[in-house]
């Protein structure tokens, strides 16, 4: 039978990936096959009790004193005396916590150790004269070979009898004490519940000698009347209720009368269990211990914090006076303590707001849920020394001082306790934040493709991002029902409102255009098929039929192919290098020329040359440039002259450099002439300006003619370039490029965006 363990779903409120459900394999099952009879420990109690009292099987079915787990009256069991994997609610405590073992020695503290945790709680034991009867081991019980059920020790705190098969837990786990009539009638015994926990060493000191003598007398009476706790049960044990934690004494040493109101009462699960899991005694005792420790720690911290007003007296005789002074100063201190408490996070409400659990340490739930997102820092738990000195956890910010109380850093992880509000919150988080989570998030389990067509879903017309899209096929079973859901009482409740959890789509798209009818001859004996098969299987050879000759031939063929490819790459690289070199050199040369012309136009002294009209064309040089640009755009010009040839003459650059030098010298001479002209008359100035303008106009005309007369380069047939200009969209006449203009006409920068298609 496959038993599914309850697991968490992948909800955002629990901050973690979902645990993949796996069927139990042979590796995960425990080693060694145990029969169903040995898997529970209830048969040990029932069999021993039946052997003692001679109870028949018919009475077992109707008896309520037997274990509820293996009886026929239990509704959970399908068969008579066998278990089916379901635990009754009252018996969960027998399987969740291992019963603690106690060994009490003289003048030593008894250490209560449990196999579940590494914690150890210390209880002080009184000076027991000859308490060897309280020392238990499994060897004493094994000698009796389980012929009789031994009486539960009365003076012990929590005892357990270990057998060869399984540890028989006492009734302390289920908040009941089984008291035999002989012991209850002879002496008022101490209850083994939480109210009978022996006082600690710190509280044992202020007890008076009278209390110590009374305890010693009761223990001696116990040892004399009941010499050894090997008392047989001759009747049905009486069940006595345990006192609740509210009405227990502050010293926790009060005794409860052993006689109950009813001598025989049936075991009812509803009244026996006060908390989930049947761990009432464990949690109440743990809460009482932690409360006591926290109260003592609070007192110690108060003494250390607010002891600066109290005068320290070394002698012991003045201790009474210091106590009286401290009592007088307590009222005056209250205002200061209230101010400090307002600033510090020491009030319980502020601790609760900071998720500081003061009454319980939820160690099991915090260990089971390790946070995935935030790194967890290891901190020491809050412990108390025997000398009542607070152990502050060593932290980085220890510079604040040891006098300030520091609460331990509690790494909070949410528990698995599910309520109605938590279920609603998880559902709202899933439905609301599904549209906000990105697809590439590590923690998001919803994968949304980029090119999503807005499909009309059942709920809304927009595309819901919470829908699941098929991805890579996986062999895991959880890929089938990979949808947002919540587990409540081991039942998966889906949160998606869609009818189908997986988006219905075609996995295999068949192209109908490629389908054609095949005759039986063509389908089998087609020449295309033979050619394709020969090409696909040309490099194939069976591993058993390969020879060394075939390997040599393949190596030679591969080497030849690599050599041919390398040669082709070298030639193509050389061609591209030459083309780019030529292109860049021509562009740089044109930009140098354009910048020189722009500098001349922007110069206010030489700007008059471009704006004055010439006598031949009756227009300025600037207007001539614009006219040439417009005529070039309107005409069906040829392609650009940049790639007309691969080689570029070095004479062009030399001529441009010479032109630049001549222009600079002329400008300097003109500046000198202007300085001299300022001293002369106005008539001389006009004559000099006319001469200078004519000289500059001639030089500019010479440059334009030289650039226009450059011999065109030879064209390569294997390179075709089409250039597009932004004017082609408005008018097809402007389909040519800006770069295709003659170099002598272009007077502006070439940095305009140009789309180039090679």
From Swiss-Prot:
Induction: Expression is controlled by SWI5.
Phosphoserine sites (modified residues): 25
Coiled coil (UniProt feature): 648-711
Keywords: Coiled coil, Phosphoprotein
Gene Ontology process terms (BP): maintenance of protein location; positive regulation of mitotic actomyosin contractile ring contraction; protein localization to cell division site after cytokinesis; regulation of protein localization to cell division site; secondary cell septum biogenesis
Compositionally biased intervals (Basic and acidic residues): 690-702
Disordered: annotated segments: 55-77, 314-414, 636-702
Compositionally biased residues, Polar residues: 338-348, 355-368, 400-414
Cellular component terms (Gene Ontology): cell division site; cellular bud neck; cellular bud neck septin collar; cellular bud neck split septin rings; cellular bud tip; nuclear inner membrane; plasma membrane
Knocked-out gene: effects: Increases frequency of mitochondrial genome loss.
Acidic residues: compositionally biased ranges: 651-689
Superkingdom of the source species: Eukaryota
Subcellular location: Bud neck
Positions with biased composition (Low complexity): 315-330
Family of this protein: Belongs to the AIM44 family.
Other noteworthy facts: Present with 238 molecules/cell in log phase SD medium.
Stated name of the protein: Altered inheritance of mitochondria protein 44
Organism, scientific name: Saccharomyces cerevisiae (strain ATCC 204508 / S288c)
């Amino acid at each position: 039978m496959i038993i599914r363990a309850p697991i968490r779903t992948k909800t955002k409120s629990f901050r973690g990936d979902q645990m993949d459900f796996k069927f139990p394999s042979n590796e995960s099952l425990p080693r060694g096959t145990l029969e169903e009879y040995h898997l529970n420990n209830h048969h040990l109690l029932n069999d021993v009790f039946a052997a003692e009292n001679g109870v028949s099987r018919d009475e077992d079915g109707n008896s309520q004193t037997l274990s509820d787990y293996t009886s026929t009256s239990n509704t959970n069991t399908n068969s008579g005396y066998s278990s089916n994997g379901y635990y009754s609610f009252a018996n969960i405590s027998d399987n969740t916590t291992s019963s603690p073992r106690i060994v009490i020695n003289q003048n030593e503290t008894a250490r209560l150790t449990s196999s579940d945790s590494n914690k150890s709680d210390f209880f002080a034991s009184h000076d027991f004269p000859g308490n060897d009867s309280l020392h238990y081991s499994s060897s004493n019980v094994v000698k009796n070979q389980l012929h009789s059920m031994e009486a539960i020790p009365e003076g012990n705190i929590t005892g357990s009898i270990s057998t060869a098969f399984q540890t028989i837990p006492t009734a302390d786990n289920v908040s009941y004490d089984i008291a035999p009539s002989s012991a209850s009638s002879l002496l008022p015994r101490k209850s083994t519940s939480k109210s009978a926990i022996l006082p600690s060493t710190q509280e044992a000191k202020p007890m008076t000698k009278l209390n110590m003598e009374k305890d010693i007398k009761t223990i001696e009476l116990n040892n004399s009347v009941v010499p050894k706790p090997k008392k047989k049960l001759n009747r049905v044990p009486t069940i006595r209720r345990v006192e609740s934690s509210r009405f227990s004494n502050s010293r926790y040493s009060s005794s409860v009368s052993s006689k109950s109101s009813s001598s025989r009462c049936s075991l009812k699960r509803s009244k026996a269990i006060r908390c989930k899991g049947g761990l009432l005694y464990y949690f109440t005792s743990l809460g009482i211990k932690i409360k006591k420790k926290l109260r003592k720690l609070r007192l110690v911290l108060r003494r250390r914090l607010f002891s600066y007003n109290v005068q320290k007296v070394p002698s012991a005789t003045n201790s009474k006076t210091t106590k009286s002074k401290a009592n007088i100063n307590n009222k005056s201190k209250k205002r200061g303590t209230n101010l400090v408490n307002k600033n510090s996070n020491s009030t319980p409400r502020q601790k609760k707001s900071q998720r500081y659990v003061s009454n319980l340490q939820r160690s099991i739930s915090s260990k089971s849920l390790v946070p995935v997102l935030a790194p967890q820092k290891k901190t020491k738990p809050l412990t108390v020394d025997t000398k009542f000195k607070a152990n502050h956890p060593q932290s980085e910010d220890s510079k604040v001082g040891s006098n300030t109380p520091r609460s331990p850093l509690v790494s909070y992880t949410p528990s698995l306790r599910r309520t109605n509000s938590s279920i609603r919150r998880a559902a709202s988080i899933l439905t609301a934040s599904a549209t906000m989570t990105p697809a590439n998030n590590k923690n998001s389990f919803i994968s949304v493709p980029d090119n999503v067509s807005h499909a009309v879903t059942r709920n809304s017309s927009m595309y819901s991002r919470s829908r699941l899209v098929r991805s890579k096929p996986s062999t895991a079973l959880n890929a089938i029902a990979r949808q947002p859901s919540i587990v409540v009482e081991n039942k998966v409740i889906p949160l998606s409102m869609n009818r189908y959890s997986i988006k219905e789509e075609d996995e295999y798209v068949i192209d109908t255009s490629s389908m054609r009818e095949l005759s039986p001859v063509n389908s089998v004996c087609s020449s295309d098929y033979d050619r394709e098969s020969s090409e696909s299987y040309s490099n194939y050879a069976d591993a058993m039929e390969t020879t060394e000759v075939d390997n040599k031939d393949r190596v030679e063929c591969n080497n030849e192919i690599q050599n041919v490819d390398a040669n082709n790459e070298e030639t193509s690289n050389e061609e591209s290098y030459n083309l780019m070199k030529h292109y860049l050199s021509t562009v740089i040369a044109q930009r140098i020329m354009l910048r020189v012309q722009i500098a001349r136009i922007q110069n206010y002294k030489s700007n008059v040359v471009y704006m004055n009209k010439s006598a031949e064309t009756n227009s300025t040089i600037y207007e001539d440039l614009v006219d040439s640009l417009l005529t070039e755009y309107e005409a069906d010009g040829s392609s650009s002259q940049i790639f007309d040839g691969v080689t570029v003459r070095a004479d062009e650059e030399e001529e441009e450099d010479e032109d630049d030098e001549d222009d600079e010298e002329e400008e300097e001479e003109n500046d000198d002439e202007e300085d001299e002209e300022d001293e002369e008359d106005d008539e001389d100035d006009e004559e000099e300006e006319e001469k200078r303008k004519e000289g500059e106009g001639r030089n500019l005309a010479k440059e334009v003619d030289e650039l226009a007369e450059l011999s065109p380069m030879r064209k390569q047939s294997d390179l075709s370039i089409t250039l597009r200009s932004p004017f082609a969209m408005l008018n097809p006449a402007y389909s040519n490029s800006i770069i295709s203009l003659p170099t002598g006409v272009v007077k502006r920068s070439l940095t305009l965006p140009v789309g180039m298609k090679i």
